[in-house]
Amino acid sequence: DISDKLLFKSGSYDVTENAKTVLGKVATVLKNQPEIEFMVEGHTDNVPYKGNNGVVDNWDLSVKRATSVVKILQTKYGLDPAKMAAAGRGEYKPLADNATKEGKAANRRTRIVILPQLDQFFQLLEPKETK
């Protein structure tokens, strides 16, 4: 997980310059494993979104943040867009209690999730031939 405090200004989905350095490190790791597919998930706290910028609510903000990260990984760092997905979880998958300031901060995050290779998974489920 990467804290959204590092990646974005409050209520924004524009990635900060400092965050681009962190994403560069992530990109280096992912480039060295070209077979890996991954999803970038945006998460928010439960405070209702009150900004503008074409953002409707926290769910929308989380999707736009994930998409911003994916676009930077593609355009700035050359990662294969066919290996990436962007998703927003909004406030609906918190790590911590939203009743505290610390909990809200923990819940505002972006997560990079390595996706399983489903063909390999299904091969594991197939019965092995015995000789």
Features from the language model and the residues they span:
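Extended, gly/pro-poor, charged amphipathic helical "stalk/hinge" elements that serve as dimerization
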Residues: 1, 5-7
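Periplasmic OmpA-like peptidoglycan-binding domain that tethers envelope proteins to the cell wall
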Residues: 12-25, 33, 43-131
